[in-house]
Amino acid sequence: MLNPILYLAVFSLVFSVVLRNGLPHFPVYLLSGLLAWNLFSTSLAMGARSVVDNANLVTKVYFPREILPLASVGAAGVDFLTQSIVLVGFMAAFRYGVLGWNLLLIPLALVGLLLFTSAFALLVAALNVQYRDTQHLLTLALLVWFWLTPVVYPSALVWAGIHRFRFLYLANPVADVVLGFQRALYGVVSPTVVHQGGKVTTIHVLAPVSLGWLVMLLGAVAVGSAVMLGLACWRFSTKDY
């Protein structure tokens, strides 16, 4: 419960006070992206250590080893539900309600995220058994991955600057999922903000990806991740861990 609140306090101070980005309803925007990111990163961090940390159990009792990293995803899912309560609380406090068809993006994005995360958790768990530095390299990789994913900054800023390379940005499955969560929970692509003095400014926050394209992207993530998970489970079962 404290993790998303701590993130919120730090990033709100940096981006709203120090950098003065003026992003409207920043807590809602930040938490909607953190929901997806924390589920992904926490699952991988725990999944990478799952087999190694349970070495005594693995050597004494036979059971499908893939249960261990997949259980890490399940544990992170419990945290996801807790953090969802925090987000709902902030939305209620800000009287920020989002209704409409965009909410249907959440189950599609969540399914894709769980499949992708499960496949990746199996991969890093297997690698960490053979190469113990994997969990340390994973920490660095997740740090880079975090900043390649539009959690704390408006995706519209990146979208406007990369032009022909936008397809590379959307090739990041976690970015696609985060965009789905933000479109569903944060809502509008370009909110209009009225500043002091009556000046009206339109701030572009979310990348202008059409709802249809976003659905196709999330569908592709789900299908591709399902194939990855099947292959990962098969490969994991053939190894003697």
Annotate the PLM regions.
Residues 1-241:
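Hydrophobic transmembrane alpha-helices and immediately adjacent juxtamembrane helices
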